[in-house]
Amino acid sequence: MPSQLAYLAGVFDGEGSFGMWSKGKKKGKEFRASIEMCDGDVIFKFLSHFKMGSITIRVPKNKKHKVTYHWRVNHDKGKQIVREMLPFLSKRRQAKFHGILSGLDK
């Protein structure tokens, strides 16, 4: 559904992130796409639409803070999702993604 994809890409463009993340000492880096926010219904739309990834619910120790929902997808599945959203992402995000992929090819 293109309108759903465009909506999710817009939310991701504003609130999400992607890049190469360290897995720990001597283990190298992996690609990750993720988004974290207080609106759980929006986060669950990512899981429902893309049918991959995982959601972590973080309950803060401080009662004044809100519960947050974190959706994350690693490796090739993360790249696949960003590629699907790419036409709807800002030019800056598109350039960043292509730059990351160029770095992986080296």
Where are these regions (language model features)?
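Internal intein/HINT superfamily modules and their associated LAGLIDADG
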Residues: M1-K106
